[in-house]
Amino acid sequence: MDKLYRVVIIDDDEFSADNLCLELKKYNRLSIDGMARNGVNGRKLLEKVHPDLLFLDVELPDMKGMELLEQIRGAITWNMQIVFYTAYDKYMIYAIRGAAFDYLLKPIDKNCLL
């Protein structure tokens, strides 16, 4: 049996997060195991779920996505890939420096998820 990959989405934009969730559900090997609307709740969710894949918005209401990544980096003891996800391409360099696995622009182009 193929491995089921656990996914968490941290994004304050409900429409974008729901749209991403809808697209990801089309892939049988992905399980959406949680969504959070801010960094504080996102951190708690990550500690609880231990996802394989994190879609992280760059600008959250309580902190930047990079700040959250810096806070949790030492606590991540499992293999988790991070996809930074934002409406602004100016953050691409921060994503790369932050060891992001990938980078997606909002609105999500479903062809970019392949």
Residue ranges and their predicted role:
Residues 43-114:
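CheY-like receiver
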Residues 2-3, 77:
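Short, flexible coil/linker segments at domain boundaries that flank nucleotide/cofactor-interacting
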Residues 23-27, 45:
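Alpha-helical interaction/dimerization surfaces of two-component signaling modules
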Residues 4-15, 20-24:
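Conserved acidic segment of CheY-like receiver
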Residues 27-33, 78-80:
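A generic structural motif
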